[in-house]
C-alpha cells in the first residue's frame, strides 16, 4: 500500500478499521444474549482486504 493514499481508499480503510473491533462488554451482559464475540474480526496479516 503506497504512503500516498487516495481519499476513497482512506475512507474504506477507516471503515474497515472501525468494523475491526471487539463487541462492547455491555452487549455481552444483556439478558438472553447469544453474541459472545465479533465473528467478523480481521487480522491485518492473515486476511487482506482485497483492494
Curated annotation (Swiss-Prot):
InterPro entries: Ribosomal_eL39, Ribosomal_eL39_CS, Ribosomal_eL39_dom_sf. Keywords: Ribonucleoprotein, Ribosomal protein. The keyword Ribosomal protein applies. GO terms for cellular component: ribonucleoprotein complex; ribosome. PROSITE patterns: RIBOSOMAL_L39E. One of its GO terms (molecular function) is structural constituent of ribosome. GO terms for biological process: translation. Belongs to the eukaryotic ribosomal protein eL39 family. This is Large ribosomal subunit protein eL39z. It comes from Oryza sativa subsp. japonica (Rice).
